[in-house]
Structure formats: C-alpha cells, structure tokens
Amino acid sequence: MFRALARASATLGPQVAGWARTMATCQLLVAPPEALLRPLSIPNRLLLGPGPSNLAPRVLVAGGKQMIGHMHKEMFQIMDDIKQGIQYVFQTKNPLTLAISGSGHCALEAALFNILEPGDPFLVGVNGIWGQRAADIGERIGARVHPMIKDPGNHYTLQELEEALAQHKPVLLFLTQGESSSGVLQPLDGYGELCHRYNCLLLVDSVASLCGTPIYMDQQGIDVLYSGSQKVLNSPPGTSLISFSDKAKNKIYTRKTKPVSFYLDMKWLANIWGCDGKPRIYHHTTPVVSLYSLRESLALIAEQGLENSWRQHREVTAYLHGRLQGLGLQLFVKDPALRLPTVTTVAVPAGYDWRDIVNYVMDHFDIEITGGLGPSMGKVLRIGLLGCNATRENVDRVIQALQEALQRCSRNKL
C-alpha cells in the first residue's frame, strides 16, 4: 500500500506543484458582494396582473420542504401524482402527459420542437403576443410559417380557419385559448374536428386560461395542449404542463429528423415521467422543490373541483366588470362571450398615460396591475384574477386603487 502511495505521489508530483504555484500567484479580485451580506427582503404585494399570481398558502409551505433526490422512488411518485393532476385539469386520458422543467415558453418550444420538422407548413393564429412567439419559434426551426394576423381583441371563426387550412394544408395549427395580452377568449368547440378533416394537428396555449374557463382536451379534439404553473394554479413560475394526443405522439415517433433540442426531446421526457412503460433513466435534473409546489397546486384544484373553479372565476370577473364600468372605464373586448374570465383588459382612458396609472396603484397600494403587451401595448390595462386571488375583496381593493389613481394622475385634456 505504501509503495502504491509513493508511486502515486511521484506521478502527481509535477501536477501538485503546478497547483501550488497557481494558488501562490493568483489572488481573489472580486470581493463578496455587499448586497448578499444583507438579509433578503421581499415586499408583501397583491399580484393582480396577468401572472405570476400570489402563491396559495399550501403551495408556499410545499416550497419550503427539504430536498430529496430527483431519481428517488418518492420523487417518481410525486411526478406520477402531477401527471394525474394534469390529466384532470386538461380533461384527457393521454398517456403522454407530463410537466416541463421550464416556464410556459418552454412548453411551447417543446410542442413545436417535437411536432414540426424543417419545411413543415405551420398555420399560426396571431391575435396577440403568444401567436407572435409561436410564429417566431416556428421560423427558427425551419417550418414554413403562415400567420393569420388579427388585431388584438379578435378571435378566429371556424369559417376563417377552414379557408386557411384548405389554402395552406398545414401539419399544425396554433391557437391561444386565453390571449392574456388582449383579454380575448378563443372558442374551441369544433376546431379540433375541423383540423382533423384537413389532416392537421391542433396545438392550444392555455397558459392564462387553464382552470379559469372550461377546456376539454379529448372531447374538443386538441392534439397538443400546454399551460403554465404561475397563473390560476398559484404555483411558482418555472414549471409547465403539456399533453400529446395519440395522433401527435405518432407524429413525434415517426419524425425523419431529431428534435432540435435534447433538453426538450419528448422521447426522453416521456421516459423520465414514466409515460413509456420503461424503467426511468436520467435525462436531466428535475426542479424537485418546484415540483412539490406544482403537485400541491394541482391537489388544491382537485379538492375544489374544476367546475367550482370555473364558476369562481366567472362570477368574480363579472363583478369586476361591473365595478370597472361603474368607474366609467371601457372593457377592451366588446363581446361578453369572448372575454377571458382570468385576465380583464380595460381600454386606457382618454388623456391618461397608462404607466402613470400602473405606477400609482403599485406605489400607493402595493397592488400590481399591468399595461398591454406586444400588439396591445399602450392600448389596455390588464387586471388578473387568478386562482386564490379571484375574490370580491380583491376586486374592491383594486377598484379603490384605480379610482384614486384616476383622480390623482395627471390627464392630458387635449
């Protein structure tokens, strides 16, 4: 043993000497940041924008639990619980159902990276920022993107889509159920059936709408559905939900090329999430604590019941609409049937700078509301009633804040 140690020392001698010289000649040039030597301080704020939302107390507790390993059997059970929860809120029996280690953008990329190949025709409903993003990602992976552009606040009819499907013959159609940048709710009944008549898959973004308004993945013929954790689910940002129909799964498994992303390769993700019936093998380190939180947020919805959650958002948002109109404000989406029950858009009142209103509400009331986003920038104010934040008490608080802001903020009378 001693001879072996001596031989190892002789072999490593020059290398060890080099390390010693490096340590002797190099010095720390960056001091510990003073900011990190102070305690973390977070304001207590009511988040009534389009998301993220405040965390439900049970979700907050889950985020403080101790780590376990991402490949432990207990973690796999938590992942199985999450999968069943996603199947419930999506109303699907799809085996290929899982959570993505990343926000809603990650789920959108996972959908497009796995379904589309270079040269595939891709039809995109662009009536807000999320359609813009989908078209952008499609172009980046070499799809032939055909955008159907509409002004913010408008939706797509079956007739319009049928004409576009017949013209472009896409393999995939993208629609946003809840366009949070404009506050419009896209109808979905009959759209999956229409797509399938033209041999096209239907991809739907439900990030801002899930659990706030009905969606039935299987019954509505949706082939790929994704959502986020930080809206009605009241969970931290950083995880997202996704599911693929058998038709979509077949498209994935018969690709001619590999998906452009290894991290979002659905064949790998299907395995780590127990969707392929094979022993799970390491792909990436899943965000263990975030998955605790997601599991608990789905449990809360399961306990409340989807229909009760839908009713809560519909009734509280109707109350908000009445209070806003009582202030003389105009709702941006004119047709009540097309108003998103989770994110309400208000036309910026004449003469006001929307930034003044948003800043006043934040500075004086610690309430977040936001302006528009993408095509709706400068046109609207956005108020979100998401999950546990969807209460009449919160409506009264934000109305009081808006009323004072309209009285105190400067107004251009020209």
From Swiss-Prot:
<feature type="modified residue" description="N6-(pyridoxal phosphate)lysine">
    <location>
        <position position="231"/>
    </location>
</feature>
<dbReference type="InterPro" id="IPR024169">
    <property type="entry name" value="SP_NH2Trfase/AEP_transaminase"/>
</dbReference>
<keyword id="KW-0663">Pyridoxal phosphate</keyword>
<protein>
    <recommendedName>
        <fullName>Alanine--glyoxylate aminotransferase</fullName>
        <ecNumber>2.6.1.44</ecNumber>
        <ecNumber>2.6.1.51</ecNumber>
    </recommendedName>
</protein>
<dbReference type="InterPro" id="IPR015424">
    <property type="entry name" value="PyrdxlP-dep_Trfase"/>
</dbReference>
<feature type="transit peptide" description="Mitochondrion">
    <location>
        <begin position="1"/>
        <end position="23"/>
    </location>
</feature>
<comment type="similarity">
    <text>Belongs to the class-V pyridoxal-phosphate-dependent aminotransferase family.</text>
</comment>
<dbReference type="GO" id="GO:0005759">
    <property type="term" value="C:mitochondrial matrix"/>
</dbReference>
<feature type="binding site">
    <location>
        <position position="382"/>
    </location>
    <ligand>
        <name>substrate</name>
    </ligand>
</feature>
<dbReference type="InterPro" id="IPR015422">
    <property type="entry name" value="PyrdxlP-dep_Trfase_small"/>
</dbReference>
<keyword id="KW-0496">Mitochondrion</keyword>
<feature type="modified residue" description="N6-acetyllysine">
    <location>
        <position position="334"/>
    </location>
</feature>
<dbReference type="GO" id="GO:0004760">
    <property type="term" value="F:L-serine-pyruvate transaminase activity"/>
</dbReference>
<dbReference type="GO" id="GO:0005739">
    <property type="term" value="C:mitochondrion"/>
</dbReference>
<dbReference type="InterPro" id="IPR015421">
    <property type="entry name" value="PyrdxlP-dep_Trfase_major"/>
</dbReference>
<keyword id="KW-0808">Transferase</keyword>
<dbReference type="Pfam" id="PF00266">
    <property type="entry name" value="Aminotran_5"/>
</dbReference>
<keyword id="KW-0032">Aminotransferase</keyword>
<dbReference type="GO" id="GO:0008453">
    <property type="term" value="F:alanine-glyoxylate transaminase activity"/>
</dbReference>
<dbReference type="GO" id="GO:0042803">
    <property type="term" value="F:protein homodimerization activity"/>
</dbReference>
<dbReference type="InterPro" id="IPR020578">
    <property type="entry name" value="Aminotrans_V_PyrdxlP_BS"/>
</dbReference>
<feature type="modified residue" description="N6-acetyllysine; alternate">
    <location>
        <position position="247"/>
    </location>
</feature>
<keyword id="KW-0809">Transit peptide</keyword>
<comment type="subunit">
    <text>Homodimer.</text>
</comment>
<feature type="short sequence motif" description="Microbody targeting signal">
    <location>
        <begin position="412"/>
        <end position="414"/>
    </location>
</feature>
<feature type="modified residue" description="N6-acetyllysine">
    <location>
        <position position="256"/>
    </location>
</feature>
<dbReference type="GO" id="GO:0019265">
    <property type="term" value="P:glycine biosynthetic process, by transamination of glyoxylate"/>
</dbReference>
<keyword id="KW-0007">Acetylation</keyword>
<dbReference type="InterPro" id="IPR000192">
    <property type="entry name" value="Aminotrans_V_dom"/>
</dbReference>
<feature type="modified residue" description="N6-succinyllysine; alternate">
    <location>
        <position position="247"/>
    </location>
</feature>
<dbReference type="GO" id="GO:0046487">
    <property type="term" value="P:glyoxylate metabolic process"/>
</dbReference>
<dbReference type="GO" id="GO:0005777">
    <property type="term" value="C:peroxisome"/>
</dbReference>
<keyword id="KW-0576">Peroxisome</keyword>
